Regions:
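Phosphate/pyrophosphate-binding loop motifs in nucleotide- or prenyl diphosphate-using proteins
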Residues: 1-202
Length: 202
């Protein structure tokens, strides 16, 4: 049945699109928050920081991602900005380069002991939330494969950047050491079950 609004869209069709549009709005909002979080990290970095060009490029990529999310995938002759494979590949290469400059992880490390690193650590958390929102949208409508991949790689990179910024500022990394209760629970899970008692032969 057609609606009386003159838009030519059925009430049933509009209702079917509502969950998709809610998911799109949540994903778009999360990416906007991520861009703002990276802006805070940039503001905390000194002007001569080697991370500024990288983070500035990432902010520009997030504008592309916002455009990508704002418009559904349809057969348009002039498609809007979309996240492309080359942008994901750049993140991967940059992450590998940054990893070579920090001490290899041998335990769970808590970065963020300088102001800029703390901002990057917060941006990492926002990025993971944006990744979940984008994945939720992808379950409801066909989407390009590069949206979630970009955010997944960006989350990895922001964590490594936070560690590298701590190293540059001389902040000592802190290792997360499990509590005694956590170790006891882990030991219970891996302890072998006792063998059943043997019955005497009849």
């Amino acid at each position: 049945m057609r609606s009386q609004s003159g838009s030519g869209v059925s009430d049933r069709g509009a209702a079917a699109r509502a969950p998709v549009e809610r998911a799109r709005a949540e994903a778009f909002r999360a990416v906007g928050e991520l861009e703002a979080a990276i802006g805070l990290a940039l503001a905390a970095l000194p002007d001569e920081s080697r991370f500024r060009p990288w983070l500035t490029r990432i902010r520009a990529d997030l504008v592309d991602l916002g455009s990508d999310l704002a418009l559904p995938f349809e057969g348009e002759r002039r498609p809007p900005l979309r996240i492309e494979a080359r942008q994901v590949q750049w993140l991967e290469a940059t992450c590998e380069q940054a990893r070579r400059e920090v001490v290899p992880l041998r335990a769970f490390m808590l970065p963020g002991w300088s102001e800029a690193a703390a901002c990057l650590r917060a941006a990492h958390g926002v990025c993971r939330r944006a990744e979940r929102r984008v994945a939720g949208l992808a379950r409801l409508e066909p989407a390009g494969s590069h949206r979630a991949a970009y955010l997944r790689r960006l989350g990895d990179l922001l964590f490594v950047f936070a560690r590298a910024v701590d190293a540059d500022t001389g902040a000592r990394p802190r290792l997360r050491r499990p509590s005694a209760a956590t170790l006891a629970r882990a030991a219970e899970r891996i302890a072998p079950e006792p063998a059943p008692p043997r019955q005497a032969p009849a």
